[in-house]
């Protein structure tokens, strides 16, 4: 059984192919390049699967930012939250956890109990608690993003609640002579502080991190103050696409089970006749 999952982000499109219960292919393409080079536009957007090197998919599920953008021909669209919850279940093997997904321009916090989503908080209105904020700050500091997100010690205080004003505040701290290390730590701690209000109602022992920001060492260190067990998924950026594959495979298995049941009923009815 082969399933393909696609997560259409604002900056990148992530694709995953799952054969049986193994991921056999994963890759990402810039969003503009994806629509320009791999799609045609008629009544619906049609993805050129051959051009992507994907053949023989029996299930195709899509998710992403914006409902209309994910309505692709031959793909069944699902909402982002469901995709990321399924992805976290698939990657972690857990049934009970709090999921924190920090994407490029939104944040999702979900409570999962016995593999079922039971509570949810979203922030899709402000970039100050998202990955785009970290990218902008790294650009101001002229430092690679993965390097900036390592620092935790002696953070400078950054109080602005707006991503735009935060840049000006950071430049002011640079002018005051703050060290690069403390500036980086300040950026990381300010992200943590902005996430705290969303996390307040989600008390629990185990936190699963997804999204590109999950790779940052500093955020994981700060979150250890609030949770006993911090789990960073192996493929945090591909989590949504993996969740799509997981759901696609689950539906295929249900169809097979249904076919088997119908076949058994058919055989039983024949035996009764004869």
Please report, for each region that a protein language model flagged, where it lies by residue:
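Conserved phosphate-binding/catalytic loops in two-lobed NTP-binding clefts
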Residues: 76-81, 224-243
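Short glycine-aspartate micro-motif
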Residues: 3-7, 59-61, 95-101, 208
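Short beta-strand-loop/turn "lid" adjacent to the catalytic site in phosphate-handling enzymes
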Residues: 31-34, 50-82, 92, 118-120, ...
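Adenine-nucleotide phosphate-binding core of ATP-dependent small-molecule kinases
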Residues: 163-203, 237
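Glycine-rich phosphate-binding loops at beta-strand->alpha-helix junctions
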Residues: 65-66, 199, 203-226, 237-240
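Glycine-rich phosphate-binding/hydrolytic loop that grips phosphoryl groups
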Residues: 86, 131-135, 139, 233-273
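Short glycine-rich, Thr/Ser-proximal phosphate-binding strand/loop in the N-terminal lobe
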Residues: 3-40, 117-126
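Glycine-rich phosphate-binding loop plus the immediately following alpha-helix
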Residues: 114-154, 159-162, 246-250
């Amino acid at each position: 059984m082969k399933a393909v999952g696609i997560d259409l982000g604002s900056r990148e499109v992530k694709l995953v192919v799952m054969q049986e219960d193994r991921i056999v292919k994963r890759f990402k393409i810039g969003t503009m390049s994806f629509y320009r080079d791999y799609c045609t536009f008629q009544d619906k957007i049609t993805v050129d699967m051959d051009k992507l090197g994907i053949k023989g998919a029996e299930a195709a599920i899509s998710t992403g930012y914006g409902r209309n953008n994910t309505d692709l021909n031959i793909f069944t669209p699902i909402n982002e939250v469901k995709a990321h919850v399924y992805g976290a279940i698939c990657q972690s093997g857990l049934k009970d956890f709090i999921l924190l997904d920090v994407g490029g321009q939104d944040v999702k916090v979900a409570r999962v109990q016995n593999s079922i989503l039971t509570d949810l908080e979203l922030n899709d209105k402000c970039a100050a608690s998202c990955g785009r904020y970290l990218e902008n700050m790294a650009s101001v500091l002229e430092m690679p993003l993965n390097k900036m997100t390592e620092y935790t010690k002696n953070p400078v205080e950054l109080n602005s609640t707006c991503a735009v004003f935060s840049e000006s505040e950071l430049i002011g701290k640079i002018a005051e002579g703050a060290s690069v290390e403390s500036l980086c730590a300040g950026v990381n701690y300010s992200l943590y502080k902005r996430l705290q209000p969303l996390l307040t109602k989600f008390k629990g022992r185990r936190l699963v991190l997804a999204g590109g920001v999950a790779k940052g060492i500093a955020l994981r260190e700060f979150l250890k103050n609030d949770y006993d067990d911090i789990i960073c998924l192996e493929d945090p950026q591909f989590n949504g696409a993996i969740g799509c594959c997981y759901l696609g495979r689950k539906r295929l298995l249900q169809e097979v089970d249904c076919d088997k049941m119908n076949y058994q009923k058919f055989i039983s009815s024949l035996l009764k006749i004869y």
